[in-house]
Amino acid sequence: MAWFRRKQKGILTPTEHKKEIPDGLWYKSPKGKIIQIKELKENVYVSPEDGYHVRIGSKEYFELLFDNNQFTEIAANLTSADPLEFIDNKPYTQRLQQAQQDTQLKDSIQVGYGPVNGNSMVIACMDFNFIGGSMGSVVGEKIAKAVDHALEHKAPLLIISKSGGARMMEAGLSLMQMAKTSAKLLQLAKARIPYISLLTDPTTGGVTASFAMLGDFNIAEPGALIGFAGPRIIRDTIGRDLPKGFQTSEFLLEHGFLDFIVDRRMLKATLTKLLTMLANN
């Protein structure tokens, strides 16, 4: 098959004749599978080649779950203050402004209320692109308002977690949100209103240690990293190699921390089945 071999080496195509490949035309999964971005979007950002679930944000989850993407946003304009006047390599206020500019979000969580296959639901979804999906006072307050809305309308609550944990720039105020969100979710339990927690890649730190693991059903996407401290920190602390697949959703399911794993393409149908089953009991 020498048809495509050049007889002369070193022949260069003039720059003006080269065809440019547009940025973002292809996606390469961690396993090396190549897929067109258009096909990836049509497949709700799941690689059809290997099933890899690409990280997405609240915009994409809301488009996937709410019927015709119709929903009412709750507490849309809440933003973090800076009572500690925190500064690391830049002031916290500047970091917030930069994150808001880059993501077009107010903070690392959005809350919406609308129909999911005709059934009303409150959905709170975290965005990892906003300061690592970190949990600060706004996250705690928005989850509290999501619970209040679910109680008022007797609607089930879904929280989609994707976070690096508590936001260090808010220090103790951030850690307080662990107790605040846990206490609010207890109100849902007492009212017998379902709370489903979906853990996605990654869910770690104080988020895992609070609302992410308190669902009536704790479910996860395939291959998600879920834990408190990261695997590198644990390995360095105990001085041992960790089991294969440690802290993946499959590992947690095998050890009883999750109820089941759901493919993102089946998420909406699975939620509907789950809530129908609960409504009939």
Curated annotation (Swiss-Prot):
Classification via Pfam families: Carboxyl_trans
Q: Where in the cell is it found?
A: Cytoplasm
Q: How does it assemble?
A: Acetyl-CoA carboxylase is a heterohexamer composed of biotin carboxyl carrier protein (AccB), biotin carboxylase (AccC) and two subunits each of ACCase subunit alpha (AccA) and ACCase subunit beta (AccD).
* Descriptive protein name: Acetyl-coenzyme A carboxylase carboxyl transferase subunit beta
What's in the GO CC field?
A: acetyl-CoA carboxylase complex
By sequence similarity, the record places it as follows: Belongs to the AccD/PCCB family.
Q: Which SUPFAM superfamilies match?
A: ClpP/crotonase (SSF52096)
- UniProt keyword Protein transport present: no
Q: Which gene encodes it?
A: accD
| Main enzyme class | transferase
Q: Which GO terms describe its molecular function?
A: acetyl-CoA carboxylase activity; ATP binding; carboxyl- or carbamoyltransferase activity
